[in-house]
């Protein structure tokens, strides 16, 4: 009985093969166009169901028109890589056609394809033609169309109802065209669309509610569109979306608000975007997210505290090939219980904290090879790893520092080094060494450092102010992460900003030099003198520290101020603990150079000067005019001397009186004179001295005094 069944089955198989052979022979010999291949081939439906279909393959034959003797039984017609630009009625008899491939031809208009009456067509390939627009209802006869590939064309315009009639469309490829806008009305006719690829179009931007009609969309690709921002409501309505790609755009931050509107997202691709940092809340409460890619980001420098928060289903994170990624906060992950694979290779990481790994209870594998690892206490846990975590490519894990261990394998070094505390190290690429910003903008400087124990981070401004997280200022704000925010930056805010990371082991510093509108205040000067107010007889000056050292330790041993103009030069010793002086008894409308010279306890000298002109005074007495008047009076007296002896007597009397009145100006009129001012003014000016006196006292010991910017002194 079994043998009989076997014989029957064998006969059926032979009969089937014979019928297939006869069918193929019939198609090939009597109804197959010349040079084409006609046969039964495997075919998969858009739902990936396997079938066999009568196929006519006329690919790459340089045809200029469709062959005329096609069988009406044809189900798949392949005409890829030909030179066809227009059809007549060759397709009208192909009632059973389910797939049509016109890719890589010369069509410029969809109407010229001749798609009328192809009611059974499910897949249409029109990619790599020269189509420039899609007009209203251009595909309305394709009621069963499920896949439309019209990518890599020249389409710049799509009418609002271009996809009318395509209610069964599941997959739409519009990528690599010339679209500048995305119109949500396109999708009103495609409610069942599941896959949309619209990347590599020069769109001006994504708009709110752009994809709202696509409630059944499962995959959206927005790659290579030069997008710089994603509005908060751009993804509203995509309740079924599972896969989203922003690959190769210009996003500078994670579009966290938009991502919160996609509740069922499982796969997110943010690769190759210039995102600077992943910060708190960027990936939060994404309850279905399983895989996240943040690879190949040329500007990514840090993953901050709580950057990944409450992601209960995340199993894989890839953050590789980021050349500036040098810092991952020890608390970067919070409530990420399912993470199994953590890929961090080929970055600029010096270390990864043990606490970071311990916060991931289900972690199975980690990759940190091909990073410039610092082999000290921060990664000492690797050698004492007692978990089941597998390090991928451990033989590619080498020390980059300290210098004596450079090039050694990590595990080899950590066996020798068991220290539990180590110096802070500021991440090299966390902020730029130099930058030029526009006046009035807000500037952010991100300073990140790793050490055990965790370091305190603060900043020192160009004028020596220390900025901490407790600092209250309208100009500066420091986050707990170490980011300095400078609001409404002005030219006077330019200079060298120093980040200091400090713990019990010591400190590390790094400097950023900021230009404002291309201008940089002289950063080589430790101090700079400014004119705050000018009057006819006085000048109010102040000075500021402009140093890249910590000014809390900056001490001056002496300070000297010099006032100079063509008629007078004098010098004064001033107290070292003040920043403001009022210079009085000056002449109106006169040019002066005011210089401040300070010396520190190491006898290093710094000098800053400013030129200033006093204001005009209507009733000010001009000395040169007085001198001219005096000479004229003498001449007139001589002329009238012969007239009256009495007049001569009066003249000499007045002359004698004026001489007594101006006795104190004789020295003042000497251009090269340098006088001690205590001859002219009250005893308060005994703080001052002439140039000669300054030289005598220059070597005197002066107790260093810490600079106090709150005091103001007056010179009379």
From Swiss-Prot:
Localization in the cell: Membrane
UniProt domain LRRCT: residue ranges: 371-424
Example of a GO cellular component annotation carried by this entry: extracellular matrix
Known glycosylation sites: 96, 117, 385, 517
Domain annotation Ig-like C2-type: ranges: 424-515
Biased composition (Basic and acidic residues): 691-700
Main localization category: membrane
Membrane-topology annotation of the record: Single-pass type I membrane protein
UniProt domain Fibronectin type-III: residue ranges: 525-617
LRR repeat residues: 73-95, 96-117, 120-141, 144-165, 168-189, 192-213, 216-237, 240-261, 264-285, 313-335, 338-359
Extracellular side stretches: 26-631
Cytoplasmic side: 653-716
PANTHER family found in the cross-reference section: INSULIN-LIKE GROWTH FACTOR-BINDING PROTEIN COMPLEX ACID LABILE SUBUNIT ISOFORM X1, SYNAPTIC ADHESION-LIKE MOLECULE SALM
Protein name: Leucine-rich repeat neuronal protein 1
Native source species: Homo sapiens
